[in-house]
Amino acid sequence: MVIAVLAVQGAFAEHEQMLGRLGIPYVELRKKEDLIQKYDGIVLPGGESTVQGKLLKELDMFDTLKQQIQEGMPVLATCAGLILLADSIENDDREYFKTLPVTVKRNAYGRQLGSFYVEQEFKGIGVIPMTFIRAPY
């Protein structure tokens, strides 16, 4: 099994780290030629959906990736990845893959500036680093 991770922008490194910890081989998708090989699934990471969509089109990856998803390639999508898949975006007229029959709302929980990081100590556990981000819904 080999999983592809869209690596043109966004939080792809975190997904790669987790796949690595699980012992799952992965490859980064950065250019059209990376889509020639067939993969067992793809991760569409969080990041900025408008930038990811623009880069996918500029790199001539958009149509091929959309076709592979339409043909049934399994997808794990987080944040911006969900927006790329959504059939409809409530507060944005841009369209991307439109392969998932859901409606999402961009920046539903606030802008990126509303995100923050904090370390909190929990009794009996210790200090836990926590990142709170805005996300679509």
Regions found by a protein language model. Name each.
Residues 120-137:
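Active-site oxyanion/phosphate-handling segment shared across diverse enzymes
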Residues 49-120, 124:
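Cysteine-nucleophile active-site neighborhood
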